[in-house]
Design a protein with these regions (language model features):
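Structural/interface elements that position substrates and couple domains in central-metabolism enzymes
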Residues: 1-427
Length: 427
């Protein structure tokens, strides 16, 4: 096998676009997405996800297309499509199936004198999916045999949206493939952009499992801190003081309790529990952690109602402002946002619930309260956008005299509210 002379990235979302741009600086690269509008916008230098600057896109040599034929003769194909869950929390492999079928169709038309292409999957999934689900689809559509006519590989994405410190270049890349030779080639390709280095897993299933457990671990740790924060609250203990004290021990790992949303941490555990069930194992601890984090919206809603009543007021006579609607801070991604779920839940009990997020459109439901000097009975800091956390005093000023400030982000120091008459509560 030879080192590939070109790369095609299938799927230009939050993961695929930065990846394709990085490779384009090193080797001829095509970025494919079946969303023609997405391609048109990118050709104009517009990333609707607000992750990549316009000048970076327009200055790149990346070839952008929605034409499937671009995949046909590529030597190295990388798949970065989303892998969500269904409404009943089962793996939703629809996009993975579609991408695999498309690649198979295109490989059927491949020139016979070209070497077997390497097809790398980066999408998070359960152990065995690449070889047992994706591979057979490509075989069926292409008429080629996996491991001969094309080579499967897996290198889990480790993108942390909005994080300028942990990037493609600074995070070790895990790679794997059907053969040792192919794994070596995959590693050499990724070393071009992964300056932190490459870790070669012994097989594809191991690499798949490594990605899933990364997010399962984080989900469980946050669940532990969420549950203990609620316990300590009932005891009248400030959980942040508890965690700070415990953190003085060298082997205590600290996490911030809060809402767990998005398309990775609250999704990936279900891929592992699904796979566990297929081999006859009930993953009770993982599912318990998921239950804790999924129930935080309702628990916080009830807690705020309790705070309002303790102040002598009624929720149905209370006006609320929720700051932040994306699933995490400083990212323009609203998918599976628990802040949005909290908004819906509180709208059932409170007189009015307004929201503001700097990453949302400037419509009637997203008016900047800082510009109109509005005041609210309850202000909930749900997402720690820099616009909010850099001006906590302005957030405090949004609360009416004797009102309530709720911090779900851990960004507000209690001392910042000491000189006011408002009631302050945080996880």
């Amino acid at each position: 096998m030879k080192t590939p002379s070109d790369i095609t990235v299938v799927g230009l979302g939050y993961v695929g676009l930065p990846l394709a741009l990085a490779f384009a600086d090193q080797i001829p690269t095509v970025g494919f997405d079946n969303d023609s509008l997405r391609i048109e916008q990118l050709l104009e230098g517009v990333d609707r996800n607000r992750e990549v600057a316009s000048e970076v896109i327009t200055a790149s040599s990346l070839t952008l297309t929605s034409n499937e034929n671009s995949v046909t003769n590529s030597d190295f194909i990388i798949v970065t499509v989303p892998t969500p869950v269904t409404e009943d929390f089962r793996p939703d492999l629809t996009l993975l199936e579609s991408a695999s079928a498309m690649i198979g169709r295109r490989l059927r038309d491949r020139s016979g004198d070209r070497p077997a292409p390497i097809v790398v999957f980066e999408s998070t999934t359960y152990p065995g999916c690449t070889e047992d689900f994706c591979g057979p689809i490509i075989e069926r559509e292409s008429g080629l045999k996996s491991g001969e006519g094309f080579i499967l590989a897996y290198s889990p994405e480790r993108t942390n949206f909005g994080d300028v410190e942990h990037t493609l270049g600074t995070v070790v890349k895990v790679v794997s493939a059907q053969t040792d030779e192919a794994a070596g080639i995959v590693g050499s390709v990724y070393r071009r952009i992964a300056k932190a280095g490459v870790h070669t897993a012994p097989d594809i299933k191991t690499a798949e499992a490594s990605k899933v457990i990364e997010n399962v671990q984080r989900d469980l740790n946050i669940a532990l801190f969420n549950e203990t924060a609620m316990i300590f609250d009932r005891m009248g203990i400030d959980s942040s003081d508890v965690f700070d004290a415990a953190g003085t021990k060298w082997n205590f790992h600290q996490y911030q309790p809060g809402l767990v949303g998005g398309h990775c941490i609250p999704v990936d555990p279900y891929y592992l529990t699904y796979a566990a069930k297929q081999v006859g194992y009930q993953a009770n601890v993982i599912l318990a952690g998921r239950s804790v984090n999924e129930n935080m919206v309702d628990r916080i809603d009830l807690k705020i109602q309790e705070l309002v009543r303790s102040a002598g007021n009624s929720p149905d006579e209370t006006d609320v402002l929720i700051l932040g609607q994306t699933f995490k801070s400083d990212v323009a991604d609203f998918r599976n946002s628990k802040a949005m779920n909290l908004t819906s839940a509180m709208s059932e009990s409170f007189r009015s619930v307004a929201t503001f997020d700097p990453f949302a459109g400037a419509d009637d439901g997203n008016q900047d309260p800082f510009d109109c000097a509005a005041k609210f009975d309850v202000v909930v800091l749900a997402v720690g956008h820099a616009q909010f956390t850099k001006s906590i005093s302005k957030v405090v000023d949004l609360v009416v005299a004797g009102g309530i400030l709720v911090d779900l982000t851990g960004r507000v120091d209690r001392s910042r509210t000491a000189d006011s008459d408002l009631l302050f509560w945080k996880l």
